Amino acid sequence: MRAADEIYLDYGPFGRVIPASSIESFAADGTVDDELAPFINAIPEERQPDFQRVLSTPLELLSSGIPEEVTDPFILSQWLYSPIGESVLARIGRLIQTEGRQNGQRAIRAAIILAAADPAGLSPINLIRHYPTGGIRLDLQQILALAKAAKTNLAITDQLISSATQLSEAAAVAAPILDYSTLPILAEFDQFNVVKQSLMLEDSQRNRIYPANLYMPENLSAIQGPIPVMILSHGYGDTKDNPEAVAAARKLAANGFVVAMPEHVGSNKTYQNDLLAGLAQESFEAMEFVNRPLDIRFLLDTLEQRNNTEFQGRLQLDRVGLIGHSFGGYTVLAAGGATVDIERLQRQCDLDADITPENVNVALLLECRLLELDESSIQQLTDGSLADERVELEFFPCHSLQTDYSQALRQTHVP
């Protein structure tokens, strides 16, 4: 098996070469030879042992928070061959190239999978050992520019957090002292016992079958007037049975709401597990960008059909609220009338564009899969036809997408 013999460090027209054996020796016992000395000496002396340890320590031993799946060679292979994995590797491969200055995408993938399968584990030094070309070429100019941009972004984030903290502390000082022990317990506000009803929805037009759960007050006749309806849309790789979401649904139902929770079968936990088990080629279907808001629409259509027979016509289906997190946040936005700026997305997803912290954002990589859709599907995403006029309220703590929706949100008047 071939391994990388040399590490090429390129910075514009300038370059240096470090023998891989020099890095091996340093990782093994701290030996610093003449070729490696200029680089090791640039690291503060007190940090050099940490650098040595990181080079030779498998990923799973560096942090106790690393899931086992991250270092499983089969699961890694499945993910790295998926559309999102390919996209990630293509971007990294521009920074870490082959000896012949080709994109290192395939070589990096091979090194990761082989290192993960090696008893020595997924460590930087083992990646070098399993890199399948004679040399690894690092584009330092791009790597340093990316690191600088990331550092700037972190500084801006820290500044925003600091400013928000100062404002919060100032408001707390100005506000009267609140004795929380005197406040009522939220659970005491619950007015109704809650029951759960399971549905199986079959949308023949889309050839799509998916389950949904309803949470509602046990005694609907005890509610006066129209019964408000909320729909909760789960996130990417999640499920309608998420305990936290179910708890929120039950809390709403205990206070007079009928809450519906659909299972988005093309982007749920089961679909993601199928990828890891080798039963699927992708972690979610690109058509989910269309199907998710249509799941909401068909669910509302189903509730309208059942309203007169099961709910005495009292469900307030002309003023529905939506709640969504992550991919569910996108679902809420689309069902409320927000559209996608395709031209901007194409620029952000361009693999030949300069690499920035923004275009290696995982959320953007998810969104880039939208460009796989056919023309008619993309048309639905850009013309607002996925909107449902029955939606009157949206709440999305966090949507999964990188795209700036400030322009798109002007397409909807939903608060």
Residue ranges and their predicted role:
Residues 224-235:
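Short beta-strand element of the alpha/beta-hydrolase
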Residues 15, 27-178:
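Mature extracellular/secreted ectodomains of secretory-pathway proteins
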Residues 301-304, 329-343:
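Short glycine-enriched nucleophile-adjacent loop
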Residues 366-415:
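The feature captures the conserved acid-bearing segment of alpha/beta-hydrolase catalytic domains
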Residues 169-226:
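N-terminal cap/lid segment of alpha/beta-hydrolase-fold proteins
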Residues 322-324:
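Short beta-strand immediately N-terminal to the catalytic nucleophile in serine-hydrolase-like folds
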Residues 281-317, 344-365:
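Alpha/beta-hydrolase active-site loop
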Residues 237-246, 251, 263-291:
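Cap/lid segment of the alpha/beta-hydrolase catalytic domain
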